[in-house]
């Protein structure tokens, strides 16, 4: 198990140590081979090929049972720019329209027959070509796979989404997910023999259609069941493409349309996108308040005891009485402003707020999610949104530090960036003549004296993250 985990993480040294302790056991050999093949070191790659040759030489009759090892080495060859592409794709009996078919692989016919009909082998080939940077040929392999009649799985669809994001066509990635997961695709009948690859230009990938419906003798409709990992790949690609509003719309449709349950990574991407959309929007933002309300609803639904948490700024102590008095005064001001606004507007707002009304998942929120939520709350203090006022800004300021009480109650240790954010904002908005000792004493009691950021650390963080606000 340790060798397999090390192989997944790409830790060649740990995988080698496990392999040596197990004295070359069959399971450890495959894990060690994967660790070597996924390494970026040329020496590790040469060792992987030597180990693979030894495995196939010592047990040639069992080569058909080593299909996963063949797939691992196929991916390694596809990602190695020193090996010509036409030699790599020939293992799956593919050739480009302008290339002659090449057969450089010494592979048993039974193994090649299994690889040709394996969706995992085609996906590994696409991933390797993407690692090489050859997006066009990677698309050609995916197109040839469905033209051959090999039904893709969710992992293959995830790789196709990555392909479109790398090519700069995020809309096509979204269309493919809806096409394969919502409507379904009728694949052609399985075919054997060599398949010709259609390799378009990268800029033309947004208009290229795959060869799936041209054959009249079609099989059943293939409809994939999306997973949370596929959804997170789509959300991450939209975030990197700066399509934040589209990301929020997709996130809102995960459960009702795709029937995908969000996880911690999904919520983290939603908070980051809502903050980025609020920063970039030229009009009052709507998704950021909705994301904030959703997160609070999710947190209090999973942990009702958090509603009893008190603000750390109201911690008892003689040096904190100014801050406590200021908080009480602001609460009275918010109450009065709310009453006057309802009387003036007739209890109706001009713009109804955007809400995220999807069912609440049960997730384990970590320190990074809380940090991005704190950044979202801080952003809402500085941007315009429907219903924004001085009273709501003061309320957000209190909530920013209430996050610390929530994390303490849930036994979640904050990131260093979160501590700097709290201390910096605390010092910025501190009332005149108020002391900073009360807040820092509360942090020291919770995390220890060493956790309180120094003035030099706060200055460096402020110059990197907050200087642009002024």
Positions of predicted regions on the chain:
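A basic, Ser/Thr-enriched alpha-helical scaffold prevalent
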Residues: 1-470
């Amino acid at each position: 198990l340790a060798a397999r985990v090390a192989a997944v993480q790409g830790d060649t040294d740990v995988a080698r140590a496990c392999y040596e302790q197990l004295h070359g056991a069959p399971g450890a050999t495959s894990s060690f081979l994967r660790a070597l093949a996924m390494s970026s070191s040329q020496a590790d790659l040469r060792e992987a090929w030597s180990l693979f040759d030894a495995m196939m030489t010592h047990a040639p009759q069992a080569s058909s049972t080593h299909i996963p090892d063949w797939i691992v080495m196929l991916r390694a060859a596809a990602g190695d720019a020193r090996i010509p592409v036409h030699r790599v794709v020939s293992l799956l009996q593919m050739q480009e329209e302008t290339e002659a078919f090449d057969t450089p692989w010494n592979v048993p016919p039974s193994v090649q027959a299994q690889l040709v009909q394996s969706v995992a082998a085609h996906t590994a080939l696409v991933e390797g070509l993407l690692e090489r940077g050859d997006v066009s040929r990677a698309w050609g392999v995916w197109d040839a796979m469905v033209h051959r009649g090999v039904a893709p799985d969710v992992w293959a669809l995830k790789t196709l989404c990555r392909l479109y994001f790398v090519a700069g066509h995020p809309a096509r990635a979204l269309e493919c997910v809806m096409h394969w997961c919502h409507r379904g695709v009728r694949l052609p009948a399985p075919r054997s023999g060599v398949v010709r690859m259609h390799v378009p230009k990268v800029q033309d990938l947004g208009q290229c259609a795959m060869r799936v419906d041209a054959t009249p003798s079609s099989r059943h409709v293939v409809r994939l069941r999306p997973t949370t990992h596929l959804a997170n790949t789509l959300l991450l690609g939209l975030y990197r493409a700066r399509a934040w509003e589209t990301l929020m719309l997709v996130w809102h449709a995960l459960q009702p349309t795709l029937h995908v349950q969000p996880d911690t990574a999904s919520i983290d991407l939603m908070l980051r996108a809502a903050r980025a959309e609020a920063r970039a929007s030229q009009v009052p933002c709507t998704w950021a308040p909705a994301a904030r309300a959703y997160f609070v609803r999710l947190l209090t639904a999973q942990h009702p005891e958090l509603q009893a948490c008190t603000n750390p700024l109201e911690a008892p102590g003689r040096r904190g009485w100014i801050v406590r008095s200021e908080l009480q005064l602001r609460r009275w001001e918010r109450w009065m402003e709310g009453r006057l606004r309802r009387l003036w507007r007739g209890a109706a707002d001009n713009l109804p707020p955007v809400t995220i009304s999807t069912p609440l998942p049960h997730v384990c929120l970590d320190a990074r999610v809380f940090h991005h939520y704190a950044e979202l709350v801080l952003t809402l203090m500085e941007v315009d949104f429907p219903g924004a006022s001085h009273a709501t800004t003061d309320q957000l300021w209190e909530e920013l530090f209430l996050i610390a009480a929530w994390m303490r109650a849930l036994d979640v240790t904050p990131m260093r960036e979160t501590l700097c954010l709290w201390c910096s904002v605390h010092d910025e908005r501190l009332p005149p003549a108020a002391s900073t000792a009360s807040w820092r004493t509360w942090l020291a009691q919770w995390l220890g004296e060493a956790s309180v950021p120094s003035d030099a650390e706060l200055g460096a963080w402020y110059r990197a993250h907050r200087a642009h606000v002024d």
